[in-house]
From Swiss-Prot:
Keywords: Chloroplast, Plastid, Ribonucleoprotein, Ribosomal protein. GO terms for molecular function: structural constituent of ribosome. The gene is rps2. It comes from Oryza sativa subsp. indica. GO terms for biological process: translation. This is Small ribosomal subunit protein uS2c. PANTHER family: 30S RIBOSOMAL PROTEIN S2 PROKARYOTIC AND ORGANELLAR, SMALL RIBOSOMAL SUBUNIT PROTEIN US2M. The keyword Hydrolase does not apply. One of its GO terms (cellular component) is plastid.
Length: 236
């Protein structure tokens, strides 16, 4: 994997609050190598380590994107839902931003069936096939379609398991990380001071609670994916 320069700026990270961790009583001792100080009862993340692992993650996704690999971005915090969707769409990635259903990847055959039903319902609605049905049936189908859109809309074009999964909140998306580990899917995860850095293939030490921090990290990764996609298009 070739190392590249991703313009990861220390001042920019400080302004975004990437370095702010949790209170010292909530920490995970496994994060000790990634913590540089304690300030007013709060752990401070070592931004030199953040820079290193964010750079490694950017290199990984760039190389994968340049080979035409697929990505899934997972972030189901309510405040981050729109950010996850817009970033994923920009980089042509799949995404889950509402709720992670247990077995979404490990029971892929079931997920694939639901996605097929979802696509069929969308096609029928677009072709106005619902108009020939009784009103009660139309209402039921529209409710079902709305639910499928809400929870599966971000993966509606996913026809196989993703090659790399990016997770924005390790603790909230623990089940997603475990499913990836079972299936051997490489993962990249933000790791706040209360997290376990061993749960992902690349853990980026960073504040996973503040929107400015999440946005900065996600934007760097998405930029690297877009650059890799451009190279793939040029070579094919």
């Amino acid at each position: 994997m070739t190392r590249r320069y991703w313009n990861i700026n220390l001042k920019e990270m400080i302004e975004a609050g990437v370095h702010f961790g949790h209170g010292i009583k909530k920490w995970n001792p496994k994060m000790a190598p990634y913590i540089s100080a304690k300030r007013k009862g709060t752990h401070i993340t070592n931004l030199a380590r953040t820079t290193r692992f964010l750079s490694e993650a950017c290199d990984l996704v760039f190389d994968a994107a340049s080979q035409g690999k697929s990505f899934l971005i997972v972030g189901t915090k309510k405040r981050a839902a729109d950010l996850v969707a817009s970033a994923a769409i920009r980089a042509r990635c799949h995404y889950v931003n509402k709720k992670w259903f247990s077995g979404m990847l490990t029971n892929w055959s079931i997920t694939k069936t639901r996605l097929s039903q979802f696509r069929d319902l969308r096609a029928e609605e677009k072709m106005e096939k619902f108009h020939h049905l009784p009103k009660r049936d139309v209402a039921i189908l529209k409710r079902k379609l709305s639910t499928l859109q809400r929870y599966l809309g971000g993966i509606k074009y996913m026809t196989r398991l993703p090659d790399i999964v990016i997770v924005l909140d390790q603790q909230k998306e623990y089940i997603a990380l475990r499913e990836c580990a079972i299936l051997g899917i490489p993962t990249i995860s933000l790791a706040d001071t209360n997290c376990d850095p061993d749960l992902a293939n690349i853990s980026i030490p960073a504040n996973d609670d503040t929107m400015t921090s999440i946005r900065l990290i996600l934007n760097k990764l998405v930029f690297a994916i877009c650059e890799g996609r451009s190279l793939y298009i040029r070579n094919h």
